[in-house]
């Protein structure tokens, strides 16, 4: 399951970041078409390092780091 902090691979072929791995910044629960905001290490042609994707366009490759109890 994709959640905040997960590492995901992009499956949208027309995307600049196709097959790249990024980190999920947030997931919108309001019902919009592209609810998953993903941040990347590199920037695209417009110097942007994030983009919105649908849940079908991302696949989780690594779960988020678990929170350590104090």
From Swiss-Prot:
Q: Where in the cell is it found?
A: Plastid, Cyanelle thylakoid membrane
Give the InterPro entries listed for this entry. Elect_transpt_acc-like_dom_sf, PSI_PsaE
Q: What keywords does the record list, in alphabetical order? A: Cyanelle, Membrane, Photosynthesis, Photosystem I, Plastid, Thylakoid
Please name one Pfam family that this protein belongs to.
PSI_PsaE
Q: Which Gene Ontology biological process is one annotated for this entry?
A: photosynthesis
Q: What cellular component terms from Gene Ontology apply here? A: cyanelle thylakoid membrane; photosystem I reaction center
Predominant location: plastid
Membrane topology (UniProt):
Peripheral membrane protein
The protein's job, in short, is: Stabilizes the interaction between PsaC and the PSI core, assists the docking of the ferredoxin to PSI and interacts with ferredoxin-NADP oxidoreductase.
Concerning PANTHER family, the annotation shows: PHOTOSYSTEM I REACTION CENTER SUBUNIT IV A, CHLOROPLASTIC-RELATED, PHOTOSYSTEM I SUBUNIT IV
**What NCBIfam families does the database record attribute to this sequence?**
PRK02749.1
What's this protein's family per the entry? Belongs to the PsaE family.
Q: What is this protein called?
A: Photosystem I reaction center subunit IV
Protein's organism:
Cyanophora paradoxa
């Amino acid at each position: 399951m994709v959640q905040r902090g997960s590492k995901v691979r992009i499956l949208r072929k027309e995307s600049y970041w196709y097959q790249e791995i990024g980190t999920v910044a947030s997931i919108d629960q309001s019902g919009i078409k592209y609810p998953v905001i993903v941040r990347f290490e590199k920037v695209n042609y417009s110097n942007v390092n994030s983009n919105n994707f649908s849940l079908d366009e991302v696949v989780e490759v690594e779960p988020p780091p678990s929170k350590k109890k104090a």
